[in-house]
Amino acid sequence: MNYSFIIRKAVESDAEAIHNILKEAFKDYVIRAKIDETVELKTETIEDIKKDLQTKEVFMGLIDNVPTGTIRVAIQDDNTAYISRFGVLPEYHNIGVGKALIKVVDKFLISNQVKKVFLHTASTYKELVTFYYNLGF
């Protein structure tokens, strides 16, 4: 199967696609992590995403020009970074989209001399914990 896969910086016109990716990815995350649906992501709006596009680095993964994944990273004043809003559409899991997004963020952070990176995830979602662990977190 041949397909085109790219990762690029997101722009304001991507905000709705980012919102849709995270909405679908979050539904899956809540089920797999066995957590309460009232987590903050549920209330994020397209306007919130547009604001983050101005203050954080936001990347998108696309397969055949279809948005499939997204990730945000903010470099803090102490030269650490925080990864947030990382999600891949469930139908694109396990084909490398998430790993590629993390690797792009990793290269971005290295180029900015960031030495420590933080993220949060549910410890009850064992596959995701293993995913992060295998990537060096």
For the regions a protein language model found, what residue spans apply to each?
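A short beta-loop-alpha structural element at the N-terminal edge
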Residues: 6-20
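Conserved GNAT-fold acetyl-CoA-binding loop/helix
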Residues: 6, 23-50
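Conserved GNAT acetyl-CoA-binding A-motif
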Residues: 109-121
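Conserved beta-strand in the GNAT
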Residues: 60, 66-74, 82-87
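Hydrophobic adenine-recognition pocket in adenosine-nucleotide-binding enzymes
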Residues: 10, 86-88, 121
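Conserved beta-strand-loop-alpha-helix junction that forms the acyl-donor binding cleft
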Residues: 119-129
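Conserved acetyl-CoA-binding loop-helix of GNAT-fold acetyltransferases
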Residues: 88, 94-107, 133-134
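A conserved beta-turn-beta hairpin within the catalytic core of GNAT-like acetyltransferases
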Residues: 75-84, 93, 113-114
